[in-house]
Amino acid sequence: RLGADAIRDCDGTEFPQELKDTGAKIYATYYTTRKDNAWAKANPDETQQCYIMTPFYTAADDALTIPLMTGISRELMMVNDHDDITRLWEVIDRTTGEPVPTADWHYDAASESVVIDAPAAYHEYTVSFLAYLIWDPVHMYNSVINDWKDVEHQIPFDVRQPKTHAYTLRRLREYLESHPYVNVVRFTTFFHLFTLVFDELRREKYVDWYGYSASVSPYILEQFEKEVGYKFRPEFIIDQGYYNNQYRVPSKEYKDFQ
């Protein structure tokens, strides 16, 4: 009746039977990396992760404590202190630009803070760390912007990792078989997540619809090192806190990562 070429769903909606029965061409949005919390909860080791940097903290004359999750929504992220933090995290003296040796700092799990035992007085420091994305950033964005109520937080999973990769292929086949009314599958988010960060009040802290910093994991970083032949540094992605947004000139290392 409206003369539409096709009917399409979107995040937060499901096709009602009335639309399926119209005879119109149907486009269906398919979520490769989410909308299956049963799988995500059963395989937390293959949850998507991201690199995040703390604010700058200035040292005085004694030990400096840097809380990791200040200014970050705990609905969105959870610190990954399960994997080797001495290899995957990086503490940087931003005054000199040099990384702080791992022997000179330690992690206090109870307070989720990094403690630098003997920092240089009045130097500024940051911590770059890995965090699990426990709420898909786009799903959170859509939920916040549209003020959705009582919506289960969709957990993103990394389709590049072995178990989830095999499951994803099977899941897609099953989807096609169980949705015969769909004419065109409109994929969204093949494997990498946009870098969308919210604070404790669900306010937008950092939004980049082109970024790759929310698509990392120890598994992927190992693949990176094997392919390029040199050691990965969190700073390749953190980029002094700019996260390699589209206004930055990318480094060789970041282009290698892409």
Each predicted region: which residue ranges?
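Glycan-processing catalytic domains of CAZymes
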Residues: R1-Q258
